[in-house]
Every structure is written in C-alpha cells, then in structure tokens.
Amino acid sequence: MQISIFAVGRMKSGAEQKLVQHYLDRFSKSSGAVGFHLKKLQEIPESRAQTACQRMEEEGRKLIEFLPEKCQLIVLDERGESISSAAFAEKLGCYRDEGIRDVIIALGGPDGHNEQIRNRADFLLSFGFMTWPHQIARILLTEQLYRAVTIANHHPYHRF
C-alpha cells in the first residue's frame, strides 16, 4: 500500500524539516516489512487569495487535482476524530488488508480544509483540540506514520 502526504504550504529549511525527513527515512526503512510504502510528499502551493474562504476553496481545488482517481483520503482536521497511535496503525493495516492501493493523508493550510475536502474524506483525523503550527503538524504526522510501522512490526519503539 502506498502512502502519500499532501500538504498545503512549503516546509522551510531548518530543524523542523530535518525532523520530518528523519521520520520519513525511518518509515521508509521499516515500512516494507508490513506492506506500507511512502510514495511521495506533495507540497501544494498556499493560496494568496484575500479571504480565508477563497484560500480554502483554491487550495481544495489544487488538492483534488493531485488526488489519484481511487484512493483512501485521510484529512487532518480539527473536526476529526482523535484516535490512539495503535488505532491509527490498525486503520492503516485494515486499508492494506482490504487491498487499498493508495492512501493520501492531507494537511491543510493555515485556514484548514474546505467543506468539499472534508466531505471527500474517508476519515477525518484530529491531533486533538489544540491548534498546531503547520510544521509541527507535519512532524506529528510523520512520527505517527513511523510509529504505526513500529506497532505493526511489534518493535519496542512503541511501548505496549
């Protein structure tokens, strides 16, 4: 199963970008054993429209353009469900076992996702009630992807 991250905005060079790459590298080295593969991290340009509504619409259109025809779409959204790391690993494992080929995980821009993206989502995921800067949300996501692989591999990184 191929997993891609579609993120609105560019990750600037620095410690955050290095940490994202660190977790993506660890994920890639460990994920093949459980049938997960990192396909790509697709950055979608942040809209420069004047209103939040216009920005979300423009970013949503761009995101839809990049989506494969058949994919499972997980959208990070404050309205989403907060689940445990083990439940996230189980969800990914279920997608794999169901023969899902492509899983896309979408991170919105500063204004979030529009209703069209939320409605298209197969699962809305939340990292809790707090608001996270985009860079930290990417770090959290990549760490959780790596953690999901370690859970599936029964690796001690995730303490059971």
From Swiss-Prot:
Q: What class of enzyme is it?
A: transferase
EC number(s) recorded for this UniProt protein: 2.1.1.177
Localization (cell): Cytoplasm
Sequence positions that bind S-adenosyl-L-methionine: L76, G108, F127, G128, F129, M130, T131, W132
Q: Name one GO cellular component term.
A: cytoplasm
Catalytic reactions of this protein: pseudouridine(1915) in 23S rRNA + S-adenosyl-L-methionine = N(3)-methylpseudouridine(1915) in 23S rRNA + S-adenosyl-L-homocysteine + H(+)
- Tell me where it mainly resides: cytoplasm
List the keywords (alphabetical): Cytoplasm, Methyltransferase, rRNA processing, S-adenosyl-L-methionine, Transferase
The lineage's top-level taxon is Bacteria
NCBIfam families to which the protein is assigned, alphabetical: PRK00103.2-3 (NF000989)
Q: How does it assemble?
A: Homodimer.
Recorded family membership: Belongs to the RNA methyltransferase RlmH family.
Q: What does this protein do?
A: Specifically methylates the pseudouridine at position 1915 (m3Psi1915) in 23S rRNA.
Q: What is this protein called?
A: Ribosomal RNA large subunit methyltransferase H
Q: Which organism is it from?
A: Bartonella tribocorum (strain CIP 105476 / IBS 506)
> Lineage, please?
Bacteria, Pseudomonadati, Pseudomonadota, Alphaproteobacteria, Hyphomicrobiales
